């Protein structure tokens, strides 16, 4: 019998409340892959309420009220509270590698392979995830809220917009991965059907080994799609 037990409804409800109270920058500085994962970890008692630099001290106070916890200082291991920043691409140095586009959790960078990229300011969360992936170091951050920091530099409307954009980003990337997997699976099936005719390998033992490898890859692909 499976030992899996669904999450407690009260934990899920608390995670929902916490998630709505987070700024939704999806910056991962909390140590989790996204804001929802951090919210779930707090609700389950696996993370502290002081690991979100974008939310700052005001965010910690809100999370303390929601969880019944004591107000504590921001954990410096996760960063410091600061103003809202926007990513800016130096278009003269951009080589169009698309790595920043792939790294952006809210799809606010537009451009194409070997074409100039640019950031849509109104959609940028200042997550900084585009900075380390740029091979030519042509992305910088600009302070757009001066001395205002944390939630004083952010808003519930911006958080909601960012959550919606992140949800669509996840939907898009998962759909594209499925489509890519399906294309590869169709190609593998076609290769398998005409293996002897199209392969440069003529030795029967090597052909059978190649056939087994393709069949194993197809089996793994089917298993992944079924999960």
What is each model feature region?
Residues 2-29, 36-77:
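Signature of N-terminal electron-transfer/Fe-S-associated modules in redox systems
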Residues 3-8, 82, 123, 129-227:
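Flanking helices and flexible, charged tails adjoining ferredoxin-like Fe-S electron-transfer domains
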Residues 14-24, 46-54, 73-96, 101, ...:
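Ferredoxin-like iron-sulfur electron-transfer modules
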Residues 25-28, 62, 67, 98, ...:
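Residue-identity detector for threonine
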Residues 31, 104:
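Short alpha-helical DNA-recognition segment
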């Amino acid at each position: 019998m499976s030992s899996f037990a669904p999450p407690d409804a009260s934990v899920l409800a608390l995670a929902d409340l916490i998630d709505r109270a987070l700024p939704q920058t999806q910056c991962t500085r909390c140590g989790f892959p996204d804001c929802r994962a951090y919210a779930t970890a707090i609700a389950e008692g696996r993370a502290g309420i002081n690991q979100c630099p974008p939310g700052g001290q005001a965010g910690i106070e809100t999370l303390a009220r929601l969880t019944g916890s004591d107000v504590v200082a921001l954990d410096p291991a996760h960063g410091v509270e600061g103003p809202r920043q926007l990513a800016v691409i130096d278009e003269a140095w951009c080589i169009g590698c698309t790595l920043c586009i792939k790294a952006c959790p809210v799809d606010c960078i537009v451009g194409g392979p070997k074409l100039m990229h640019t950031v849509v300011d109104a959609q940028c969360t200042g997550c900084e995830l585009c900075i380390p992936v740029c091979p030519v170091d042509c992305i910088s951050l600009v302070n757009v809220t001066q001395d205002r920091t944390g939630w004083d530099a952010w808003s519930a409307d911006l958080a909601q917009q960012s959550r919606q954009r992140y949800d669509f980003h996840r939907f898009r990337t998962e759909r594209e991965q499925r489509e890519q997997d399906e294309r590869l699976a169709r190609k593998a099936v076609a290769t398998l059907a005409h293996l002897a005719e199209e392969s440069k390998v003529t030795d029967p033992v090597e052909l059978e080994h190649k056939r087994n490898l393709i069949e194993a890859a197809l089996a793994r692909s089917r298993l992944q799609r079924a999960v």
